Every structure is written in C-alpha cells, then in structure tokens.
Amino acid sequence: GKDAIENHFDRSLELQIVLERQGKQEQLREIERISELASFSYIRQKEPLGLGHAILVAKALVGNEPFAVLLGDDIIDAEDPCLAQMISAFERYQSSIIAVQQVSRKETSSYGIIDPKPVEDTIYQILDLVEKPSPAAAPSDLAIVGRYILTPEIFDALEQTPQDEGGEVQLTNGLRVLLRTQTMYGLAFHGCRYDAGSKLGFLKATLQFALKRPDLAPELRDYLKMLSLGEVGATMERDRKEN
C-alpha cells in the first residue's frame, strides 16, 4: 500500500537496533543513507479523480514554485538522469518541459501524443497535445512519458479543466489549457524507458537493474543463460527427483 512508500524513506528504530546487534553495518548504513536523501512530505489523493486532480491536491504544498511530476509506472535508465536532462532544458527555456519518446505509429493510441515543432536537437515546441489518438489521427509519433517539469500556472489551468466522461481531471487536458497562455516544450530524453505498468515491462526493468548489481549479476546471467538453453526445466526436474 501507500504506507510502504513512506516507510521506505523513513527510519525504523527497531530495524536499526536489530541490524546493529547483528553487526550488519552495511545494511545499517544503507537505510540511514536512504532516509537522508531528501526531506519528504506526503499528501494523499483521497479519491481517484485523475492525474490532474492529484496534482491539484499538492497545490498548497508546492506554492508558487516550478516542480517536477514523476510517475512511478515509467522507469527510466539513463547515464544522465532524465530529470537532470529536463532541469537543464528548463533552465534554458524557463517554461514547462515534458519528457517525450518516439513510439511506433500503432502504439499512439496508448499514449498522449504531442504536435511538435523542432527547436533544437532534442527539444520541440509543443503546439498541441492529443490523448491516445488513432495512428491515422496522431500528429506525430512522439509520446508523452511520465516525467514533467511544470510551472505553478498549471494549477489555474487545471482548475479551469472540465472533468472527462469518467469524472476525472486529466493532466493532458490541463496542459492544453495551459498552452493557451504559455509556450511549452517536449524533451526527447536520452535513456531507456520501461513501462512498469505492464507485467512484461516490470520484469524487464527488474532484470535490467539487477544485471547492474555486482552482487546479483553473475548468478543472474548464468540463470538467464540456462533459460535460453532450456536447461532450467531439466535441472528443476532432476532436483525434484533427488528430493
């Protein structure tokens, strides 16, 4: 549940005492490091009324400052973090920045798609946004990914945004309202995105990041090689018979 997020970035006195007694200094240092990454505040969206509504719930906390929105379903692996790339673009343009990624035409109906005007190598001025268009109706193949840097004007725009047929306030619709008064940019970031909202995407992300860990990678690679050679089933069957 949502408590797991808060607990992950908090300290557990009971756990720290256990780790200290067991002499597990490395694990102890790790949980202390995580709790010091930033100062965290939490606001809950009491009803599932859309991403735009969720952002509105945070209005009092954000105040009159630009802020970032990161959706957990999108996991991005990049040497230069995606958000760092976006902050660099924001510092140049001083306007809302949306992360975008090229997708195949047949996938446009699964994403918000921008109508782009090229500005520089990876930067596009956004002329319009269309939510989940058919391949024929899509203005481009540049899809919105779950990373945004938004200016506080988005709050007024969201308050002017009508609910959709499902009773939700959609961020894409709010961004279209904001486009009336603000130039907005899309950044085609450098990095690999995984859709953790799908089972396969979640598995791919888990494997990719596990293969980057020195404590897991060697044995995991061996296991994956066994899978590719069809040896795992035979090994499991042999172990079953022996037991």
Regions found by a protein language model. Name each.
Residues 1-2:
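A conserved acidic beta->alpha catalytic loop
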Residues 5-13:
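Glycine-rich loop at the start of a catalytic domain that most often binds anionic cofactors/ligands
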Residues 14-18, 25, 31-116, 150-152, ...:
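Conserved beta-loop-beta/alpha segment of the NTase-like Rossmann-fold superfamily
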Residues 68, 87-91, 118-222:
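Catalytic-core segments of class I nucleotidyltransferases/pyrophosphorylases
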